[in-house]
């Protein structure tokens, strides 16, 4: 492994540690939550459509999502390791036999539909994804509880220190009189 591949692997691991993306492939309907900056405000916008391609590898990997918006086909390319991509949710798994679904650009209506994959692999992926989401929520909740307990302990220590200081001040006043 040369130095560039090593650096890319380190960066990909660092980004993957912050957020986990589910396993998805072309044909799957995905909801991509993207951070949008408007002036000095930031908000998260959901972009839902069919993943029609995954390309590249390593840190340069990207995927293309196509949706029909007000009768017009809109495609958007998202880098997998972009900091602007908050999360990706798989809405449904599609059953396709191609890696690139560019033929959907020429199709309209029912002919552009993709059959839902209900096989065992898709079921396992969905179950694993749900389990990962539950574990992530439990971990976040545990962190919140730990932070709340630490804050309560900190407040109690501060109040005890204040009470002790007030007690010492009263003792000093009594000694001065």
UniProtKB/Swiss-Prot annotation:
MF (Gene Ontology): structural constituent of ribosome
Xref: InterPro entries: Ribosomal_bL19 (IPR001857), Ribosomal_bL19_CS (IPR018257), Ribosomal_bL19_sf (IPR038657), Translation_prot_SH3-like_sf (IPR008991)
Residue stretches spanning the membrane: none
GO biological process, alphabetically ordered: translation
SUPFAM superfamilies, per database record: Translation proteins SH3-like domain
A Pfam match: Ribosomal_L19
Lineage: superkingdom: Bacteria
UniProtKB keywords: Ribonucleoprotein, Ribosomal protein
Keyword Transmembrane helix: no
A GO term from the CC aspect: cytosolic large ribosomal subunit
Family, per entry: Belongs to the bacterial ribosomal protein bL19 family.
Role, per record: This protein is located at the 30S-50S ribosomal subunit interface and may play a role in the structure and function of the aminoacyl-tRNA binding site.
Protein name per UniProt: Large ribosomal subunit protein bL19
Organism: Rhizobium meliloti (strain 1021)
